[in-house]
Regions:
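FabD-like malonyl-/acyl-CoA
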Residues: 2-171, 299-329
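Alpha/beta catalytic cores of group-transfer enzymes, especially the acyltransferase/condensing modules
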Residues: 25-27, 118-276
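Glycine-rich phosphate/pyrophosphate-binding beta-alpha loops
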Residues: 75-77, 223, 282
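Short, high-confidence coil segments that cap the C-terminus of an alpha-helix
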Residues: 212, 295-297
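Short amphipathic alpha-helical segments
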Residues: 266, 270, 279-283, 308, ...
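A short, acidic, amphipathic alpha-helical segment used as a generic capping/interface helix at domain edges
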Residues: 277-295
Length: 329
């Protein structure tokens, strides 16, 4: 009689597989995508985007102006399309990385890019969806002045208590229904905090007393992934429901809980929540790279502007980051 471990099974060497990550808003910069223009397919992605959107996105990416590029309704398109264009570079230079990809995830907006890559969303429909998401979020931004800041802190810092003090300060100033809380879980001792602009200013001015080692404001126009974005959920969810989604061909991890989507109804339920819930990126990295001791890690490729996600991976899982590479837009 055969022992269970004697049964012949297919074996895929983890080293021969890949994980592809996509960045989010805040990574945009004037001059982005210039390095990708030598790849015809990358240029074609921009041509398609220009056609769907009705304006010259590539020109905005290459030439700015920066204040226009940083506006939510432009930044989200710029980052998503640049990321998909960077994917074309990866396909050209390392086709095996695409063919052997077993999982994908994207930070905030990047999750929609990941869903396009995984075959869930058609590119043109995703562009329209991002337009609705961005416009709805911009309306929420215009309604309440909000901001976000990256916070580095030590083991003796209580981020929750610091945010509570910021909220109380806003209440004392007469601000209606203020909010301040964690909007992104980045890596150990680093989070992004979002809330009313006055709350962020309070944290900046009182960082020493609150035992915050460093605080850096992010170039975004609102408090994303906080309840201040509540008004953006309904238009986004309504638009998402109208799109005929396909089942993902590889695992796609959700920002909301750091776990893979199970099926299309799960995507329809979770993705709108992402607008008001913290991005659990640190938790996602733990889930994606969890494996038995001694097993090799897959290659990781970050496609899009900047090298931020690979740098985060280095702090969450240094061994997994050893074989990580940024394909920069």
């Amino acid at each position: 009689m055969l022992e269970p471990d004697e049964v012949v099974r297919p074996k895929i060497d983890p080293k021969e597989t890949s994980i592809i990550l996509f960045p989010g808003q805040g990574t945009q910069y004037v001059g982005m995508a210039s390095k990708l223009m030598r790849f015809p397919e990358a240029r074609r992605i921009f041509d398609l985007a220009n056609e769907v959107l009705g304006y010259d996105l590539l020109k905005l990416c290459l030439e700015g102006p920066v204040d226009k590029l940083n506006r939510t309704e432009h930044a989200q398109h710029a980052v998503m399309v640049s990321s998909l264009a960077a994917l074309e570079q990866l396909k050209e230079e390392r086709p095996k990385a695409i063919d052997t990809c077993v999982a994908t995830a994207g930070f905030s907006l990047g999750e929609i890019t990941a869903l396009v890559f995984a075959g869930v969303l058609p590119f043109d429909k995703a562009l329209k969806l991002v337009q609705i998401r961005a416009n709805a979020m911009q309306v929420a931004c215009d309604r309440v002045a909000g901001g976000m800041a990256m916070v580095l802190y030590g083991p003796d810092t209580e981020i929750g208590a610091a945010c509570a003090k910021a909220v109380q300060w806003c209440v004392d100033k007469g601000i209606e229904n203020p909010y301040c809380g964690v909007s992104n879980y980045m890596f150990p001792h680093c989070k992004v905090v979002g809330g009313n602009i006055e709350a962020i200013e309070f944290l900046e001015k009182n960082s020493k007393a609150l035992k915050i080692r460093r605080i850096k404001r992010l170039p975004v126009s609102g408090a994303f992934h906080t309840p201040l974005m509540e008004d953006a959920i309904e238009p986004f969810a309504k638009a998402l429901k109208k799109i005929p989604l396909q089942e993902p061909i590889i695992r796609v991890y959700s920002n909301v809980d750091g776990k893979p989507y199970r099926h299309v109804p799960h995507i329809l339920k979770q993705l709108p929540k992402q607008i008001v819930r913290p991005v659990k990126w640190e938790q996602t990295m733990h889930q994606m790279y969890e494996r038995q001791q001694g097993l090799d890690f897959p290659r990781t490729f970050e496609c899009g502007p900047g090298k931020g996600l690979v740098q985060i991976l280095e702090k969450v899982n240094a061994k997994a980051a050893n074989t990580a590479l940024s394909i920069e837009a």
